[in-house]
Amino acid sequence: MADKSDLGYTGLTDEQAQELHSVYMSGLWPFSAVAIVAHLAVYIWRPWF
């Protein structure tokens, strides 16, 4: 187990934090792409201004 001195304020080690960040970012990019495409499609269909 990691020493308390190895843990950040989140309770994760540096390696765990980097792994969590990479998983989060790998999900964020596809979500953002789908959101942008959806907004463009709705704007083309029915502009809101």
From Swiss-Prot:
Topology Periplasmic: residue spans: 46-49
Keyword hit for Transmembrane: yes
Classification via SUPFAM superfamilies: Light-harvesting complex subunits (SSF56918)
Membrane topology of the entry: Single-pass type II membrane protein
GO biological process per UniProt: photosynthesis, light reaction
Subcellular location field: Cell inner membrane
A Pfam family that the UniProt record links to this protein: LHC
GO cellular component terms attached to this protein's record: plasma membrane; plasma membrane light-harvesting complex
Record keyword Metal-binding present: yes
Function (record text): Antenna complexes are light-harvesting systems, which transfer the excitation energy to the reaction centers.
Complexes and interactors: The core complex is formed by different alpha and beta chains, binding bacteriochlorophyll molecules, and arranged most probably in tetrameric structures disposed around the reaction center. The non-pigmented gamma chains may constitute additional components.
Protein name (record): Light-harvesting protein B-875 beta chain
